[in-house]
């Protein structure tokens, strides 16, 4: 096990697998430890997945969205409908959007939230369940 601090940029690039880190504003910057929350892109076999991590919002992960096949977006701190609409209107929408790390909005009414997500034009958004597999 090789544990190390990370910073923005490519943190792994071997055997056709590339992982890029980008700090988020979720926990801010600490003078001793630097950025304490990160989002990541994972690229392999011509596919790209972006994981927001705990995020302060769109501006935190937007630089990772180019050619994104699947964006895994946390909803513990964000409204999924607002996030889907913003992404659809941004001109940088991923091919697919999967919501994870669910907050109260989704936990209270997952079917209702999914029904509302289905009405957002310009993006394919789904609420994902723990343990669910998504093929790219």
Feature roles, as predicted:
Residues 1-2, 107:
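Active-site neighborhood of divalent metal-dependent phosphoester bond hydrolases
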Residues 56-136:
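Cap/insert and terminal regions of metallo-dependent hydrolase folds
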């Amino acid at each position: 096990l090789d544990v190390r601090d990370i910073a923005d940029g490519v943190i792994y690039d071997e055997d056709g697998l590339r992982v890029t880190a980008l700090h988020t504003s979720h926990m801010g910057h600490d003078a001793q430890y630097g950025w304490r929350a990160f989002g990541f892109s994972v690229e392999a076999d011509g596919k790209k997945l972006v994981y927001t991590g705990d995020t302060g919002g769109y501006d935190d992960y937007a630089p990772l969205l180019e050619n994104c096949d699947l964006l895994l977006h946390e909803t513990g701190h964000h409204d999924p409908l607002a996030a889907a609409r913003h992404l659809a209107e941004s001109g940088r929408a991923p091919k697919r959007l999967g919501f994870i790390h669910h907050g109260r909005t989704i936990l209270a009414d997952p079917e209702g939230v999914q029904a509302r997500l289905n009405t957002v034009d310009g993006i394919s958004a789904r609420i994902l369940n723990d343990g669910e597999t998504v093929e790219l």
